[in-house]
Amino acid sequence: IDLRNYGQSDIVSAYEDLGLKSYNDVLGAFDYLKHIGFKSNKIGLHGISLGAVPAIFAAYEEPAIKAIWADSTLAEFNMVLKDEIGRYGLSIEFGPVVSFVGQRLSGVDPSDLNPVKKLSNDQSYFFTHGDKDERMFVSHFEYFKSFTKKNNIKASFWLAEDSYHVDAMFKYPEIYADKMQKFFIENLK
């Protein structure tokens, strides 16, 4: 799932839904794959950037999904809000206003955008991130790492050196592919 260019499934009114509804598309694809003969324990998800949000949310809704690879994604809405407000040089006091306006315009509550709270002890995750990511700061990666350790959630991590946002797959394609292959082979049995 890659929502960096957004798709028609994510449009609510004239605004993007931050992946909060598109997890239903992922569940539809999961059901379709089962319908054409794939076993549910052989279907994993790979989400890139914002695309990891619906992948994580879909896995939360469908426990049969056992392996989720999340590349350069966000952990919690409040972290993103703080990052984005800071990026534009605004005071954090603008946060509630930005959140409220976003909810009114899009029809979705951005405070529901908390993938870290959708992680399960019954699934396996792989989080990768670029150490120089300026779009989605490394603090999100570190938060996932801390949260999964604290909550005994099965997760692996790779902080790709000298890499920016969703850059590791291009900068280190062989390593990326090898790690991904091993992760899915190990967790889709």
Regions found by a protein language model. Give the residues of each.
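Conserved alpha/beta-hydrolase
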Residues: I1-I11
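Glycine-rich nucleophile elbow surrounding the catalytic serine of serine-hydrolase chemistry
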Residues: G47-F57
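Alpha/beta-hydrolase fold nucleophile elbow
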Residues: G37-S49
